């Protein structure tokens, strides 16, 4: 399936800025990838001394393969980039559009455990306006990858700047990292906040403060 024009534009913008997730080309179909992942996951689980003949575990390698390709890492494939509705700002609306508490679940690329949090996204309309649900879908697309939160925040910013044809975009993310919570230091209360500010959100203290306020 050919990539949409929006997907091509966003991918190009990220590559030009060095913000694309590190990836190498893969010529395999999604079904072929699932078969290979299932095979290797079966070997990994066997090395962990799990009995894959047990009825609770027998389908686990297949479930994990499907989850990786079709769900939690589906954002690695730009064929899954959301269909974007951008409309001309004919009404001349020029006040901040802000979407709070966008739920996001991603995966830490260092340990492949969960990142769980919320995003706040805002923009000042110029030439274009985007359908509100598309903002949520863009956040989700980039979250469905192995990620670091700093890159994820920047990817959402650049994607919206590209599609809206304006620098005036801001993104803030607050998340719990299970690589901190469930292993290592095992800190169950800390959260991580990242921001990516563009245009007037970066240059104007009042606009920045309005965005960062509840």
From Swiss-Prot:
Superkingdom: Bacteria
TM regions (residue ranges): none
Reactions catalysed: GTP + H2O = 7,8-dihydroneopterin 3'-triphosphate + formate + H(+)
Pathway: Cofactor biosynthesis; 7,8-dihydroneopterin triphosphate biosynthesis; 7,8-dihydroneopterin triphosphate from GTP: step 1/1
Record-linked InterPro entries: GTP-CH-I_C/QueF (IPR043133), GTP-CH-I_N (IPR043134), GTP_CycHdrlase_I (IPR001474), GTP_CycHdrlase_I_CS (IPR018234), GTP_CycHdrlase_I_dom (IPR020602)
Gene Ontology MF annotations: GTP binding; GTP cyclohydrolase I activity; zinc ion binding
A GO CC term assigned to this protein in UniProt: cytoplasm
Residues annotated as binding Zn(2+): 108, 111, 179
EC number: 3.5.4.16
Top-rank EC class of the record's enzyme: hydrolase
A Pfam family annotated for this UniProt entry: GTP_cyclohydroI
Keywords: GTP-binding, Hydrolase, Metal-binding, Nucleotide-binding, One-carbon metabolism, Zinc
Subunit structure: Toroid-shaped homodecamer, composed of two pentamers of five dimers.
Entries under PANTHER family matching the protein: GTP CYCLOHYDROLASE 1, GTP CYCLOHYDROLASE I
Family: Belongs to the GTP cyclohydrolase I family.
Record-linked HAMAP family: FolE
Annotated protein name in UniProt: GTP cyclohydrolase 1
The encoding gene: folE
